[in-house]
Amino acid sequence: MENCIFCKIIKGEIPSKKVYEDDDVFAFHDLHPVAPVHFMLIPKLHIASLDNVEEKHRDLLGKIVLLAPKLAKEQGCTDGFRTIINTG
């Protein structure tokens, strides 16, 4: 999407500090962190909101959920971490 900040980050139009990237997913440190380790894990496919999720997105969202603890541990969160999903 033209005005989507996340799409611009994925395309490299807005600089970010990458944590992880594959064909489907992009993870980067939050531009305004509120914790010592604060990164965002987003699909490369533009999905504007959880309100727009469909059955066809099941595998992609599952991949993101499975990546979250792996990346958190790699970033030093060995004693637990908080996962937040913002909608809208």
Regions found by a protein language model. Give the residues of each.
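HIT superfamily nucleotide-processing domains
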Residues: 1-88
